A protein has these predicted regions:
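Active-site rim/loop-helix segments in enzyme catalytic domains that contact anionic ligands
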Residues: 1-113, 141-146, 236-249, 253-263
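The feature marks non-catalytic terminal segments
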Residues: 8, 80-81, 148-150, 154-266
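Active-site environment of divalent metal-dependent phosphoester hydrolases
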Residues: 28-29, 53-56, 93, 122-129, ...
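Short, conserved beta-strand edge motifs with alternating hydrophobic and charged residues
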Residues: 47, 118-120, 151-155
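A structural signal for well-ordered alpha-helical scaffolds and beta->alpha junctions
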Residues: 67-71, 98, 102, 129, ...
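Non-transmembrane alpha-helical segments in soluble domains
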Residues: 75, 137, 179-183
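Proline-aspartate-enriched helix->loop->beta-strand connector
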Residues: 105-123, 132
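Short Gly/Thr/Asp-enriched flexible loops that form oxyanion-binding sites at enzyme active sites
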Residues: 127-141
Length: 266
């Protein structure tokens, strides 16, 4: 075993892959802290459905300036966690889980063979977010990976309505790095408002952990749900991350909730 392997830092070729699929540049702020915790152990990939072309109004969409800005901002942010970005070039606000994009995504999944995939909440208030999850759901099926991949859902602070978390990740030790990640998205972070809101939401998630409040801890947390189809076997990627400090549950055997398109969370 090499010194790097002994330290838990593997070469890119030896790492398992983790794939995140989102609708817009900046959507991975929902899981950026977790990505920082994963970056030295896993090979990270991010698929982005659109370039967020309409994120600064129609004028910026028509002249292409918003697309150019947000593409550069996303590439810079994902470079901080060592993730490779894969663009799907659909149009912000006008994207669908159509055959071509789902097949393109399935082909990428077959190429990468990720251990785990992360998508957006399928009941999200923002239709592009929900669409991106539908694309990922269909692509996992097309790729023949439905019963042999870990499939998780990230919580988007602003729009993940009725979100029911199964896993909590303590990002307190990397929260300043997450701030820097969010601030790469300059055109969406006017007056640092997006950064302030996301960090405050993470602090509130920590306070909602009853065991944290009992033990008087303060920190920052990201939350994730489990999508139906994930095998509930001996492997769970969250078991390889540190649980929230003071967590009182049996972290490895706590039964997660699961989302099903027919019945919601159960």
């Amino acid at each position: 075993m090499t010194a790097l392997a002994a330290a838990g830092i593997l070469t890119a070729s030896a790492r398992e892959k983790v794939f995140f699929f989102v609708a817009h540049p900046d959507d991975t702020i929902a899981c950026a802290g977790t990505m920082f915790l994963m970056k030295d152990k896993y090979e990270l990939h991010v698929g982005v459905l659109t370039h967020g072309e309409r994120g600064c109004g129609e004028a910026g969409y028509r002249d292409g300036s918003t697309k150019a800005k947000r593409t550069l901002e996303e590439e810079a942010a994902e470079a901080m966690v060592g993730a490779k970005v894969h663009w799907f070039d659909e149009i912000d606000g006008d994207c669908y889980a159509n055959r071509d994009v789902c097949r393109k995504l399935a082909a990428l999944l077959q190429e990468l063979k990720p251990r785990a995939v992360f998508g957006m909440w399928p009941l999200d208030y923002h239709l592009d977010h929900a669409t991106s999850c539908m694309c990922l759901q269909k692509a996992v099926g097309i790729a023949g990976m439905r019963d042999r991949i870990e499939f998780y859902i990230m919580e988007e602070s602003y729009d993940s309505r009725t979100f029911v978390p199964a896993h909590y990740v303590d990002i307190t030790d990397v929260v300043e790095r997450k701030r820097a990640f969010i601030r790469q998205h300059v055109c969406q972070n006017a007056n640092d408002a997006m950064c302030a809101q996301e960090i405050a939401d993470g602090e509130m998630r920590a306070l909602r952990c009853a065991s944290w409040m009992t033990n008087g801890n303060r920190g920052n947390v990201e939350r994730f749900a489990v999508y139906d189809g994930k095998p509930q076997g001996s492997r769970c990627i969250f078991n390889e991350l540190p649980p929230p400090k003071g967590w009182s549950q049996d972290w490895s055997t706590a039964k997660p909730s699961k989302y099903t398109p027919e019945g919601g969370m159960k």
